[in-house]
Amino acid sequence: MKTGIHPDYVETTVQCGCGNTFTTRSTKKTGNIVVEVCSQCHPFYTGKQKILDSGGRVARFEKRYGKRGANKAANTDSADK
């Protein structure tokens, strides 16, 4: 192994936007990393996760034009009565 080719591995403080700080090790020379979210404020870890069903192309088509099979079945039931 060559000597002197590896970067220094220093103790680094990570600061989150929520105010949480923790210490880890990194090769970043300043010894300070600022992040927007961490495990203390990320919705997945806090349990405040909102599931957004944006749907895909099929859902968008069905919303725009309706489900062909569902409307057909509803129309035949009402016509039989």
From Swiss-Prot:
Pfam families hit by this protein: Ribosomal_L31 (PF01197)
Keywords from the UniProt entry: Metal-binding, Ribonucleoprotein, Ribosomal protein, RNA-binding, rRNA-binding, Zinc
Superkingdom: Bacteria
PROSITE patterns: RIBOSOMAL_L31
Protein family according to the UniProt entry: Belongs to the bacterial ribosomal protein bL31 family. Type A subfamily.
General function of this protein: Binds the 23S rRNA.
Name by which UniProt lists this protein: Large ribosomal subunit protein bL31
Organism: Mycobacterium sp. (strain KMS)
Higher taxonomy: Bacteria, Bacillati, Actinomycetota, Actinomycetes, Mycobacteriales
Gene name in the database record: rpmE
